Amino acid sequence: MQLNMLKGKLHQARVTQTELEYEGSCAIDLDLLEAVGIHEYEQIHVYNIENGERFVTYAIIGERGSRMISMNGAAAHKCNEGDRVIICAYAGVPESELGEFQPRLAYLDADNRITQRRGSIPLQVA
């Protein structure tokens, strides 16, 4: 059996621009894409921390080193510049490989610089 598992996550990325008329859905700095293993045209899920919007789109390459997170086309209606978002990609992982599977997680500051990388999410305690 294959399970859909979190593959890569950009946590608390800041939307740097919105382009309603631009072709493509979410342009992300290539350095950030590579950090979490998200590929060009790969399906991504975007969770807007500011307004609760959750939507599915796809990633396109943004200029390397720009720290760009640009919501384009219809996705531009879901976010404003400066909004904090979580961007996730998922992958099918065979149940037999779950023991060695780890997601690639990157935590960002307000300027979309990576401040921390992890392979797991800490245990939440009561």
Swiss-Prot record:
The modification Pyruvic acid (Ser) is found at residue 25. The active site is at residues 25, 58. Pfam families: Asp_decarbox. Pathway: Cofactor biosynthesis; (R)-pantothenate biosynthesis; beta-alanine from L-aspartate: step 1/1. Keywords: Autocatalytic cleavage, Cytoplasm, Decarboxylase, Lyase, Pantothenate biosynthesis, Pyruvate, Schiff base, Zymogen. Its cofactor is pyruvate. Its EC number is 4.1.1.11. Gene3D superfamilies: 2.40.40.20. SUPFAM superfamilies: ADC-like. Substrate binds at residues 57, 73-75. Is synthesized initially as an inactive proenzyme, which is activated by self-cleavage at a specific serine bond to produce a beta-subunit with a hydroxyl group at its C-terminus and an alpha-subunit with a pyruvoyl group at its N-terminus. It is found in: Cytoplasm. GO terms for molecular function: aspartate 1-decarboxylase activity. One of its GO terms (cellular component) is cytosol. Its main location: cytoplasm. Coiled coil: none annotated. It is an enzyme of class 4 (lyase). Belongs to the PanD family. Heterooctamer of four alpha and four beta subunits. Catalyzes the pyruvoyl-dependent decarboxylation of aspartate to produce beta-alanine. This is Aspartate 1-decarboxylase.
